[in-house]
């Protein structure tokens, strides 16, 4: 499913209010067209994410991490790799739950994902 090695796990973050860690806060994917902050993860519904990768090629840059209380951080919440003339993005975040619920932060982040150059 990816142009570079990426191993998915069954890991998930079940607490929709789990704190997000910004591993690369200056990365364009978090800053254009919207500046993504912790506020964009407020009001998420049900679980925050699932099928977090636990191994990936060095071509990927981990952007976000998250974890349930008492668990180790899952740094594969959002991975970006340059590929050809564009980018390959893998995300574990539960957009399929957040977008239908109208979570504004999910829409803001999705706009950034499709706008990356």
Give the residues covered by each predicted segment.
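Short amphipathic C-terminal alpha-helix that caps PH/PH-like domains
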Residues: 105-117
């Amino acid at each position: 499913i990816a142009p570079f090695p990426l191993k998915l796990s069954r890991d998930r973050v079940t607490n929709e209010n789990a704190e997000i860690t910004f591993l690369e806060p200056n990365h364009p994917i978090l800053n254009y067209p919207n500046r993504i902050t912790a506020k964009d993860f407020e009001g998420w519904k049900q679980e925050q994410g699932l099928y977090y990768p636990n191994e990936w090629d060095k071509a990927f840059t981990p952007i976000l991490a998250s974890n349930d209380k008492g668990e180790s951080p899952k740094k594969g919440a959002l991975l970006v790799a340059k590929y050809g003339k564009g980018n390959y993005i893998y995300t574990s975040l539960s957009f399929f739950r957040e977008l239908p619920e109208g979570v504004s932060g999910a829409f803001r982040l999705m706009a950034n994902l499709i706008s990356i150059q």
